[in-house]
Structure formats: structure tokens, C-alpha cells
């Protein structure tokens, strides 16, 4: 039918299961490799100020926030490299193929955040803020996520304000 896709089913582990039962080094290397590959496609930089402003107009900054829109806008990096990107690089969108014993990225999207930099920020909502395991607590999981987050800290623009921007889009 039009506007539908037929995708192969991949027998897999989701990242929650993988992280709990496997060594974290293979996943860390995979994520680092994905980001490095995306970064290698950088062509030029653009100023994202107008895109930030547009996105922030949709957020209701009430008294529950410790800063206002202008403060956040002033802290965000403006000139960002344009590159290939996933668009929704979260741990929920990485599977471990049991057949191929390797990782598979799923569900890429097009977005105005057209840089690997925003993929890092989205990934950090899972690594630093534990979004994908928000309904459970596991110290073992937390320590493994911290290892991956530490590896991502080697990339430029590993920025907490970009992380805040990504979190604002999913707040209730």
C-alpha cells in the first residue's frame, strides 16, 4: 500500500536488556564509531539561533524552571557543524541483532537539527538523564551508562545546554 514500509524483522535485544547482560565496551565502541562517522561528513557550520528561538516559543517556561528562554538561548552554542545525522539517536533506537551479533540503528528521522551534535545531545538524554529507563532504578545500569557518556565527552559540543534543549521537547 502507498505510504507504508515493509521491514525485515530482526531478532534482537533492546539496549536495556543488552546493557544489563553484556559488557558495555562493544556498545561504547559502536556508538563512538557512529558519531565519528557522522562527524566525518561535516561540511560547514550554520547559526542555529533562529531554529532555537522557533523551538523555544513552543515551550511554556513557567515558575518551575530555574532559567528563562533568554538565558537558555544565551548559553546554547550557536555555530554548529552541518553533517549527516540520525535525527533520533536514542538507546531505544539501537538494537542488538542476535543473528548478526552486531548493532542496528533504527527509526532515523529528518529534523531541523541537522547535525551529529544534536544526535549526541539526544543520546545523552538516555545516558545522563536515564530517559529510556526512567521508570526503574539500577545502579549497575547507571554505571554502564556513565561509561558511554564519558566517551561522548571527548566530542566537541558535548554540551549540557543542548541536553536541556532536547529534554524540553519531551517534558509533559
Located regions from the model:
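Long, hydrophobic, amphipathic alpha-helical segments used as structural scaffolds
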Residues: 1, 39-46, 131, 135
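Conserved short submotifs of the Hanks-type protein kinase catalytic core
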Residues: 2-14
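Histidine-centered active-site/metal-ligand motif
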Residues: 7, 39, 86, 90
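Short catalytic/ligand-binding loop motif for oxyanion handling, primarily in non-cytosolic enzymes
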Residues: 14-17, 93, 112-114, 131-133
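Conserved kinase catalytic-core helix
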Residues: 15-85, 160
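Short, flexible helix/strand-to-coil boundary loops that buttress conserved ligand/catalytic motifs
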Residues: 19, 109, 127
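Active-site acidic catalytic loop and adjacent metal/ATP-binding pocket
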Residues: 71-118
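Active-site activation/catalytic loop segments of kinase-like enzymes and analogous catalytic loops
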Residues: 113, 117-155, 164-172
Amino acid at each position: 500500500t502507498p505510504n507504508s514500509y515493509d521491514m525485515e524483522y530482526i531478532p534482537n535485544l533492546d539496549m536495556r536488556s543488552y546493557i544489563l547482560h553484556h559488557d558495555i565496551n562493544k556498545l561504547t565502541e559502536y556508538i563512538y564509531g557512529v558519531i565519528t562517522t557522522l562527524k566525518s561528513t561535516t561540511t560547514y557550520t550554520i547559526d542555529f539561533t533562529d531554529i532555537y528561538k522557533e523551538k523555544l516559543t513552543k515551550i511554556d517556561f513557567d515558575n518551575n524552571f530555574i532559567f528563562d528562554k533568554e538565558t537558555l538561548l544565551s548559553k546554547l552554542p550557536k555555530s554548529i557543524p552541518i553533517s549527516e545525522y540520525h535525527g533520533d539517536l536514542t538507546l531505544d533506537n539501537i538494537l542488538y541483532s542476535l543473528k548478526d551479533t552486531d548493532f542496528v540503528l533504527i527509526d532515523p528521522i529528518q529534523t531541523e537539527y541537522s547535525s551529529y551534535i544534536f544526535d549526541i545531545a539526544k543520546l545523552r538524554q538516555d545516558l545522563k538523564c536515564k530517559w529510556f529507563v526512567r521508570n526503574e532504578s539500577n545502579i549497575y545500569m547507571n554505571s554502564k551508562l556513565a561509561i558511554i557518556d564519558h566517551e561522548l565527552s571527548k566530542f566537541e559540543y558535548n554540551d549540557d545546554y543542548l541536553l536541556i534543549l532536547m529534554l524540553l521537547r519531551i517534558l509533559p
